[in-house]
Swiss-Prot record:
GO cellular component: extracellular region; Golgi cisterna membrane; Golgi membrane; membrane
Organism the protein comes from: Homo sapiens (Human)
Tissue expression as described in the entry: Highly expressed in skeletal muscle and heart and to a much lesser extent in brain, placenta, liver and pancreas. Scarcely detectable in lung and kidney.
Gene3D superfamilies documented for this protein: Glycosyl transferase family 29
High-level lineage: Eukaryota, Metazoa, Chordata, Craniata, Vertebrata
Name of the protein this chain belongs to: CMP-N-acetylneuraminate-beta-galactosamide-alpha-2,3-sialyltransferase 2
Disulfide bond keyword on record: yes
Cross-referenced PANTHER family: ALPHA-2,3-SIALYLTRANSFERASE ST3GAL I ISOFORM X1, CMP-N-ACETYLNEURAMINATE-BETA-GALACTOSAMIDE-ALPHA-2,3-SIALYLTRANSFERASE 2
Subcellular localization, as worded in the UniProt entry: Golgi apparatus, Golgi stack membrane; Secreted
CDD domains membership: GT29_ST3GAL2
Family: Belongs to the glycosyltransferase 29 family.
Amino acid sequence: MKCSLRVWFLSVAFLLVFIMSLLFTYSHHSMATLPYLDSGALDGTHRVKLVPGYAGLQRLSKERLSGKSCACRRCMGDAGASDWFDSHFDGNISPVWTRENMDLPPDVQRWWMMLQPQFKSHNTNEVLEKLFQIVPGENPYRFRDPHQCRRCAVVGNSGNLRGSGYGQDVDGHNFIMRMNQAPTVGFEQDVGSRTTHHFMYPESAKNLPANVSFVLVPFKVLDLLWIASALSTGQIRFTYAPVKSFLRVDKEKVQIYNPAFFKYIHDRWTEHHGRYPSTGMLVLFFALHVCDEVNVYGFGADSRGNWHHYWENNRYAGEFRKTGVHDADFEAHIIDMLAKASKIEVYRGN
């Protein structure tokens, strides 16, 4: 009898331990899966959101299913928003000239060599090989993170920026691209103070801070020789005009604009209007190929129809539209088309 009672008590105790274990496990699991834990009972002030461990994977799956290439509301390079844009855009062509795409197609080589006079014959590949011993010669935009939204401001030099008050908005972008002279000191309220990329050719080049990428737009082989010289020996002082013999820029941030990309813009986008696209067009399409969102400032005439730079008053400023080198009217049309296709946002200024 005593043995039976002992067995009965042990069985009941075992059952109670088992039930308590189940209750503890269930309560712990339930708390872990609650979307919020109100910690007011602890300190009376905070409400803490608890995120399940699988939440990141779930979000990733939804993003992949959405088909978007970035985390922006609209991703510039994604197809489907505009048939016109999709028929022109080629996301496979790199805007940067590197070791990997050093060999130009024959038609590109011929076209590029005719842009400006070549006073002496040079082997382009040999020149590039030597240049890429000084600068990286790599494409820093090869890999894109679909979980990020790379917002870019393309800042032109139009007088319509004066009094615009765009400075703070411009500075809020990830990439801020400027071209040629583009001073910021004294104009910060309208054009911003930050720059991440500055596009120049030898005749417009200036020294840059260490955190800015210098993007050389080459029109001839001599331009490649010049940048190599300006970052080393300083021997070249003249092209078709005086140039800086030495250039203070971060060598690790020097990039070379790809002539094949240059011709792609001329063929597909500006459609041979003008001899070749303007620097503004080159920068804009560079941004369209490396950014997820592109906002454009300082392009076109001001509200009075004047074409001039924001840092100067020039009564002859509209004369460049008549040179035949660039077709400003057609380029303005392309910008309008890109805006209508929701690929860029244009800020017209004053």
